Amino acid sequence: MRSHFCTEISEKDVGKTIKVAGWCNTYRDHGGVVFIDLRDKSGLVQLVCDPSSKAYEKALEVRSEFVLVAKGRVRLRGPGLENPKLKTGKIEIVLEELVIENKSATPPIEIGNKNVNEDLRLKYRYLDLRSLNAYEIFKLRSEVALITRNTLAQKGFLEIETPILSKTTPEGARDYLVPSRVHEGEFFALPQSPQLFKQLLMVGGMDRYFQIARCFRDEDLRADRQPEFTQIDAEMSFCDENDVMGVVEDLLQAIFKAVGHTISKPFKRMPYKEAMENYGSDKPDLRFELPLIEVGDCFRDSSNAIFSNIAKDPKNKRIKALNVKGADAVFSRSVLKELEEFVRQFGAQGLAYLQIKEDGIKGPLVKFLSEKGLKNILEKTGAQTGDIVFFGAGDKKIVLDYMGRLRLKVAETLDLIDKDALNFLWVVNFPMFEKTENGYHAAHHPFTMPKNIECEDIEEVEAHAYDVVLNGVELGGGSIRIHKEEMQKKVFEKINIHEEEAQKKFGFLLEALKFGAPPHGGFAIGFDRLIMLMTKSHSIRDVIAFPKTQKASCLLTDAPSPINEEQLRELHIRLRK
């Protein structure tokens, strides 16, 4: 039906007769001469038709998004008529034959216009996908999937599919449940991850497994979350953290090479505690400096009782400083007020600061600090004339969180972030357990191997867990798993999953661990999130063919939708009025 894609045609084809096919991107009638920009997956080419052509009458019928097959002769555009914005901007096709394969209603959205309301774009997603940008995104997505398969296959991994219909074993989010028609009153769950099945594959001697897995989580949505998503999932037997990290680094190096980036290995490693204390995040963005600095000891003798009391409780409290170089010249009073309002959203009571000026140190904290205290702050933060030092004080968790967010906000405001940089990082030595209102739960998941389970302070128990971070975004992570039944039961006890509940939820895993499970570990990388970062897309919805909205609905198909009474009866379900 066609001899060329649109952008395959160039000056070397001048004089040739070719056939192209695609959609009418734009249509123009200039004094009787018809110009059509034809679009296919590769890009645009201009068709031109004057009244002397036998295709002229047909060309007059063409409108936006009509499906066309065109035959014509390639010629150079006239002097001054070239379009440098197009790959085919130096040539055009003089129409000889034109077939309208299909007409189109007036499109409700402009193809390729990102300023169109997102809900409208999602409702007509099949039109939104016609944009050249969308094609490039899904072309890259396909290439990355192929690179993943080839890279892991070369390393001895087998691609094995795990069940979609499984048992409900909540991993932190709510499960999507599927009622069984055959087993009345019982339900399958869609997997939040293949975690337990891939561990069972290791017990089964598969040695190295991977799949590009579909996962489902019924959780509140954000810009980077979807109820169904894809991850690169893998597991290895007879390995330690270094082995797993090495595979991940090799894989990411191969993936980013496809888009022209050279990644150096090994990636930097940072303990969780260091990440939190110095950057206020377990996924720090290291494309810029601005570390958080502990200055609690500078406030021990402060005349402000609030600060001095905080300084005397270093286990549970923090006083953190953030020195912003040269900020005094660019941060007006209104900007300082905006920053204060920003951190208040995340639990801050306010935002104290010191301005280092030519004529001395100014700011609301000055009167509460001794000369020695001020001197110590300047030494610790390296503050100089023209800088502003911001302070956060209070409960450790809250302070680290809002000061970490402030760090990012300041970097964005001052344009300190190199948008083209790729900064990979491993965050390691995560806490094994986190405190909740009802005791403790597993920080990652309860199948992670703890490092020091006998530690008296449960909050000091660390996990053999690791996250890979790119530019402040968690790409994925993993852990070394528990491979002995006794240890697994011990971890369950720590998080108040006692014997009866453990057998009910995870009896099949505990049983499997009795039969010589090998040491094993693995990882999962968020595939959608990876593509989002590689394409610099604003939302994860841009890199999923048919995404859900932030309300977990599909505007295209109107899913979820009610079902009829007969279907409900077959599933033994009665809805409450």
UniProtKB/Swiss-Prot annotation:
CDD domains: AspRS_core, EcAspRS_like_N. Homodimer. The keyword Nucleotide-binding applies. Keywords: Aminoacyl-tRNA synthetase, ATP-binding, Cytoplasm, Ligase, Nucleotide-binding, Protein biosynthesis. One of its GO terms (cellular component) is cytoplasm. SUPFAM superfamilies: Class II aaRS and biotin synthetases, GAD domain-like, Nucleic acid-binding proteins. It comes from Helicobacter pylori (strain HPAG1). Aspartyl-tRNA synthetase with relaxed tRNA specificity since it is able to aspartylate not only its cognate tRNA(Asp) but also tRNA(Asn). Reaction proceeds in two steps: L-aspartate is first activated by ATP to form Asp-AMP and then transferred to the acceptor end of tRNA(Asp/Asn). The record marks H30, G80 as: Important for tRNA non-discrimination. It holds the Pfam family tRNA-synt_2. GO terms for molecular function: aspartate-tRNA ligase activity; aspartate-tRNA(Asn) ligase activity; ATP binding; nucleic acid binding. It catalyses: tRNA(Asx) + L-aspartate + ATP = L-aspartyl-tRNA(Asx) + AMP + diphosphate. GO terms for biological process: aspartyl-tRNA aminoacylation. ATP binds at R217, D218, E219, Q226, E474, G526, F527, D528, R529. The keyword Protein biosynthesis applies. Signal peptide: none annotated. This is Aspartate--tRNA(Asp/Asn) ligase. HAMAP family: Asp_tRNA_synth_type1 (MF_00044). The gene is aspS. Its EC number is 6.1.1.23. Belongs to the class-II aminoacyl-tRNA synthetase family. Type 1 subfamily. L-aspartate binds at E171, R217, H444, R481. Residues 195-198 are annotated as: Aspartate. It is found in: Cytoplasm.
